[in-house]
């Protein structure tokens, strides 16, 4: 059977065209074109201030994803902490299906829970409070009513503050909370969990389930997980 591919945390921006080039290379590969599905688990973009922002970056990415969709490859998207404002308009343009924060898939007989991963980092209480605020629908609606230029400036300011805070945060609170994560997996009756966000690429064999962490993309490295009937494995982009 055709494999499924999982990617996350590309953090695409005009400042890093090499990352966009990596993504386009993957999307144009024969492997992607022959996949049963591709799942993008958040932070595809480094920031997102609304579907009404039109740029060469956004347009080119949407165009290449749409080409895969038009070939019959199902493409799914889960919002991340950087691009949580991506809406149905952009997803329709790209031919992607927008998924909720948590979804359960039947992958080759293995019940698999997928999410971005930020909701699992419950020890970072300051972030969880911030997340709760910015995910309020009324606040998002008000933000999206602002002029695009204002939204861009606000997003840049928030990113600067977030970067400074991250430099002084203990590393352990920026990882998933093991007990909470295990409870979530059990609540969804899953055998496997796939998530991103922490940038700590690894396949963990936990008590009763497998937890697969997608890595971030940087320089000439792309973290791509292939899942098929034989299991799950990270495959270098060079093989595509």
From Swiss-Prot:
Known pathway: Glycolipid biosynthesis; lipid IV(A) biosynthesis; lipid IV(A) from (3R)-3-hydroxytetradecanoyl-[acyl-carrier-protein] and UDP-N-acetyl-alpha-D-glucosamine: step 4/6
Gene Ontology biological process terms in this record: lipid A biosynthetic process
Locations listed in the record: Cell inner membrane
EC number, UniProt record: 3.6.1.54
Top-level taxonomic group: Bacteria
Co-factor binding details: Binds 2 Mn(2+) ions per subunit in a binuclear metal center.
GO molecular function: manganese ion binding; UDP-2,3-diacylglucosamine hydrolase activity
Keywords tagged on the record: Cell inner membrane, Cell membrane, Hydrolase, Lipid A biosynthesis, Lipid biosynthesis, Lipid metabolism, Manganese, Membrane, Metal-binding
Protein's job: Hydrolyzes the pyrophosphate bond of UDP-2,3-diacylglucosamine to yield 2,3-diacylglucosamine 1-phosphate (lipid X) and UMP by catalyzing the attack of water at the alpha-P atom. Involved in the biosynthesis of lipid A, a phosphorylated glycolipid that anchors the lipopolysaccharide to the outer membrane of the cell.
Record-linked HAMAP family: LpxH
Name used for this protein in its record: UDP-2,3-diacylglucosamine hydrolase
